[in-house]
């Protein structure tokens, strides 16, 4: 069994125990998953909203833990909840009336960040949202294509296609940027 499969089994056991009321298991489950949940939400939404969205994800998960049966891995289950939280937030923001932007409220990037990290984030942000999501789940968070399909609610072939197209898009963007510089 791979390290990832062992870790997923451990997380699932923790979630099942937490669902039965084991507070120590709940604490261990949250600690073990919070980094992946935050990173996933930061890429789906924005880093500034990731804390609030992660909190909402865990609130929803806590309410649902007693009904979690372990048919999928707990990590897949939790990331599917995070995905729904992000989608709900986008729907909420689109439904709100647009008001003039206060320049002081605009999130300013931190100075001193490495150019490559900034460039990568710009390139990721330029991807189609479904392609970005599939790429992040498989390449950054390390989910299998099957697990990613479960999180996204689509066939595994669609996930493979989205990841392949995301890679092509990133490579094409990188080549264009190189040609502009050189």
Describe these PLM feature segments.
Residues 125-133, 141-158:
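Helix-turn-helix DNA-binding module
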Residues 4-11, 88, 94-122, 144:
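Internal acidic/polar
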Residues 2-4, 19-28, 38-56:
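Short, charged helix-capping/linker segments at alpha-helix termini
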Residues 2-5, 17, 45, 122, ...:
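C-terminal edge and immediately downstream basic/flexible tail or linker adjoining helix-turn-helix-like DNA-binding
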């Amino acid at each position: 069994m791979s390290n990832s499969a062992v870790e997923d089994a451990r997380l699932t056991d923790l979630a099942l125990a937490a669902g039965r009321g084991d507070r120590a298991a709940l604490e261990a489950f949250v600690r073990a998953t919070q980094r992946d949940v935050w990173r996933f939400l930061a890429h789906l939404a924005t880093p500034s909203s990731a804390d609030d969205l992660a909190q909402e994800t865990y609130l929803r998960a806590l309410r649902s833990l007693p009904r979690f049966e372990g048919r999928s891995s707990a990590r897949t289950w939790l990331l599917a909840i995070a995905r729904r939280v992000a989608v709900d937030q986008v729907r909420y923001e689109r439904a709100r009336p647009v008001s003039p932007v206060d320049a002081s409220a605009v999130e300013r990037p931190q100075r001193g960040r490495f150019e490559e990290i900034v460039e990568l984030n710009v390139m990721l942000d330029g991807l189609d949202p479904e392609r970005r999501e599939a790429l992040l789940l498989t390449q950054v968070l390390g989910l299998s294509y099957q697990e990613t399909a479960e999180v996204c609610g689509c066939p595994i072939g669609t996930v493979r296609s989205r990841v392949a197209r995301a890679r092509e898009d990133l490579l094409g963007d990188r080549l264009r940027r190189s040609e502009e510089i050189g």
